[in-house]
Swiss-Prot record:
GO aspect biological process, one term: base-excision repair
Xref: NCBIfam families: nfo
InterPro entries: AP_endonuc_2 (IPR001719), AP_endonuc_F2_Zn_BS (IPR018246), Xyl_isomerase-like_sf (IPR036237), Xyl_isomerase-like_TIM-brl (IPR013022)
Gene3D superfamilies hit by this protein: Divalent-metal-dependent TIM barrel enzymes (3.20.20.150)
Cofactor binding comment, as recorded: Binds 3 Zn(2+) ions.
Listed name of the protein: Probable endonuclease 4
Organism (species): Sulfurihydrogenibium sp. (strain YO3AOP1)
Length: 279
């Protein structure tokens, strides 16, 4: 059985993510542990953490994935933002460890017009500091593939490899996003394009490092460098692209987590549609 889940709200109390996942029949869930568009940090009470861990055992939804705030930029050339991003990532990862979260997914950073090589060097220094200050035991740090807008680092598999290769002894891996890789120039919705993408993933030794797939169609066309998520089958990737992924013997062992627009009962609709594509 392929594991298909979705991103859920963690508003009001973190432990409510389990009920919200169950409501849409999600096998796995992803959520934020702070507002994705605010630097504000809420200290969680011991009672809230205990409720979360109790429900984790009760609901058996697995894996649990936390997505980093969108405000972080570990490639920033603005020193204040750079340091604030590092400290905030560490803050989030400490809570992930306490809550026994399986995976922490992050957009590594944006160069925003600055030289890409220097941006990569700044991300590597940030990663080095993060890993030197934490001893991750429960949570694996995942670098997400990105679409390439605003000088995003991680829009090619070569860049992703460059970011994680120096830390092979750490708990680090990859999160593939179908919308992002399609928008960045990998034509994953044809057999030829998918096979070419998978070969490159293997060549960079990233297939075995891939732990989570963000399952999103794309509102923007192939190679657009635009990050615009769409409901499954309603975008430029189309059903065939997801059918190929879901029936691949390597990828169908991984969790497929939706990040599609939150509209009515569309999470349940998208989950059931993905299930229908499995042979």
């Amino acid at each position: 059985m392929v594991n298909i889940g979705t991103h859920v709200s963690s508003s009001k109390s973190l432990d409510l993510v389990f009920e919200r996942g169950k409501e849409v029949e999600a096998s796995s869930i992803q959520f934020f542990i702070r507002s994705p568009r605010s630097w504000a940090w809420i200290e969680r009470t011991d009672e809230e953490k205990e409720r979360f861990l109790q429900k984790k055992n009760e609901y058996k939804i697995h894996p649990l994935v936390v997505h980093a705030s969108y405000l972080f930029n570990l490639a920033s050339f603005e020193e204040e933002l750079y340091k604030k991003s590092i400290e905030s990532v560490i803050q989030e990862l400490k809570l992930c460890e306490e809550l026994k979260i399986d995976y922490y997914v992050i957009h590594a950073g944006k160069s925003k017009g600055n030289p890409k090589k220097q941006a990569i060097d700044r991300i590597l220094r940030a990663f080095e500091e993060i890993f030197s200050r934490l001893n991750l035991k429960n949570t694996t740090f995942l670098v997400e593939t990105l679409a390439g807008q605003s000088g995003e680092v991680g829009a090619t598999l070569e860049e992703v490899y460059t970011l994680i290769e120096p830390f092979e002894n750490e708990k680090i891996g990859v999160c593939l996003d179908t919308c992002h890789i399609f928008a960045s120039g990998y034509q994953i919705n044809t057999d030829e394009g998918f096979n070419s993408f998978k070969k490159e993933l293997i060549d960079y030794n990233l297939l075995e490092k891939t732990k989570v797939i963000h399952c999103n169609d794309s509102k923007a066309p192939f190679n657009s460098k635009k990050d615009r998520h769409e409901h499954i089958g309603k975008g430029f990737i189309g059903l065939e692209g997801f059918r190929i992924f879901l029936n691949d013997d390597d990828f169908n062992k991984l969790p497929f987590i939706l990040e599609t627009p939150k509209e009515g009962d569309m999470d349940r609709v998208n989950i059931n549609l993905l299930k229908s594509l499995i042979k």
